Amino acid sequence: MTPQERRSSASLALIFALRMLGLFLVLPVFALEARKYPGGDDAALVGMAMGIYGLTQGILQIPFGVASDKFGRKPVMVVGLLIFAVGSAIAAWAPTLHWLVAGRALQGAGAISAAVTALLADQTRDVVRTKAMALVGASIGLMFALSLVLSPFLASFIGLHGLFAMTSALAVGGIAVVIWWVPPEPEKHVDQARGGVLSVLRHPALLRLDFGVFVLHAVQLSMWVALPAMLVQAGLARDQHWQVYLPAVLASFFVMGATLFPLEKKGYLRAVFLFAIALIALVQLALWALAHTVAGVWPMALVLFVFFCGFNVLEASQPSLASRVAPAASRGAALGVYNTLQSLGFFAGGAVGGWLVKSAGAQALFLASTLAMLAWLGVAWGMDAPAPKTGLKAG
């Protein structure tokens, strides 16, 4: 990477990190802490509170992405982070679960993911973009690992209200990074092609990735509706869950580094991509089996490690592929569609996951997740290997 590419990658990764740390801090304790609110014993409503963030973010990802093509990436990022900070403040104040849903919905309205990834794509060459996207993915993963350690500890002192207040402060910090550290945008942007969104929606290779990111994040979020309770049943107190999460996340980073980058250079990215999808399908099947009994801590830890191995590979490679195949003139729109499906996946995972657990139990949730991953594997199977420095063709 050039110095400019390193600065761009590091600063944009930090923005993602600050924003995602706030989101991740509440995730491990949300389902348990939400029970303290009026109506908190309703698993479907708790799932809605977890997932509504993804619905509003999904609705606004495309408008924010198109706006970043027209008005510039950095102004859109500042506006989005400001909205996110206000939503976090409302969630911190929320006296009821319904107000918490409202705050989470406003959090999601700060839909900057497309603008951030588009700016990163603008400022990096194709040949190093997977590394740049992986740096962003690694920063998100590290924030997740950090939140697993801090979340139960902080929640015991400041509760869910305090965690949301911290989230608001972190978003303000992200605004400072955008203004003072992110490199200036290119002075001249390619004008967005007329009908760019429609052309993106007709792009077969992008549609495969859009479907995949929806399934991946629906499955990821739905897991957290059931996993904390399963770990408690396994004999691990809530404030000890990080002892399972943290080693699994950190070890999976080493696996990603040892597999994704070397195999991509050798032309095996398609094989690694498909293997990672199959791996997560097997994880969901294993969780379905474990949900039929009181699982031990070690089997749960092993399953989570395998999950994060597959998840990290997909989280690093998918946005890189999307940015590489997207037309340059409508890159913001293309990544807006991609991030819309990602956000809708979050919403579906929370809402449908909560409903399934409430109506049919964790077994039904993990069975549905297994089938969803197998469907994605079938869709992704037809993709061609990405061409060097360009992307992948539609199969």
PLM regions: where:
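C-terminal transmembrane helical hairpin of 12-TM major facilitator-type secondary transporters
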Residues: 270-318
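C-terminal membrane-cytosol helix-exit motif in multi-pass small-molecule transporters
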Residues: 168-187, 379-384
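Juxtamembrane intracellular "pre-TM" segments in multi-pass secondary transporters
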Residues: 1-6, 182-212
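Cytoplasmic helix-loop-helix junction between adjacent transmembrane helices
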Residues: 103-141
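Residue-level signature of mid-helix packing/kink "hotspots" within the transmembrane helices
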Residues: 54-62, 144-145, 249-257, 346-347
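Cytoplasmic membrane-interface "Motif A"-like loop-to-helix N-cap segments
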Residues: 70-80, 265-278
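Helix-to-loop junctions at the C-terminal end of transmembrane segments
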Residues: 60-72, 254-269, 357
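Conserved MFS/SLC helix-loop-helix module at the cytosolic interface between two early adjacent transmembrane helices
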Residues: 59-95
